[in-house]
Amino acid sequence: VIRERVLLADNHQNMLAGVRTLLESMFEKVFMVADEASLLEAAEKIKPDLIIADLSLPVTMEINIARRLYNTFPDIKLIILSVHDDSIAISECMEAGAKGFVLKRTAVNDLVPAIEAVLHDASYISPAALVKPESKALYMKNSAS
């Protein structure tokens, strides 16, 4: 067990179930929510070590969730899960305070390295999202900071 508490926010039950099994082997307590309001409430209540949140949670203004989480809970590390692999989404999430960006289609391979990197104060972007030159430049910028 690496840490005590992780909070997973995703409105897709299959994703929650698959990721939960993985997280239970890495954390003492795994909490799950399915929307932005529940995420913010749970983060306030349980103060997790890590939040893994779907970029497209219901009632979310997408990027705003990363910014809101970072502004409200700057000490909680954040990894964004997303189906979007465009450099603008990645850049906006990372600039908003996320430390990791994992594509849902590669999460089975990328989530553990992302968690390990982020918990050790490094950043992580799914390698499959880095095939575009502008995404590679973004990764280099975030790795240097």
Where are these regions (language model features)?
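Short amphipathic alpha-helix used as the core "switch/output" element in two-component signaling
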Residues: 63-75
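Conserved active-site segment of CheY-like receiver
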Residues: 11, 81-85, 104-106
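Acidic catalytic/metal-coordinating carboxylates
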Residues: 35, 61-64
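Two-component/phosphorelay signaling modules centered on CheY-like receiver
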Residues: 13-31
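Short hydrophobic/Thr-rich beta-strand motif most characteristic of the beta2 strand and flanking loop
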Residues: 7, 27-37, 42
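Residue-level signal for the "D+5" position in two-component response regulator receiver
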Residues: 32, 57-60
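Short, flexible helix-to-coil linker/hinge segments that flank and couple to helix-turn-helix
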Residues: 89-95, 99-145
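Active-site residues of response regulator receiver
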Residues: 54-55, 82
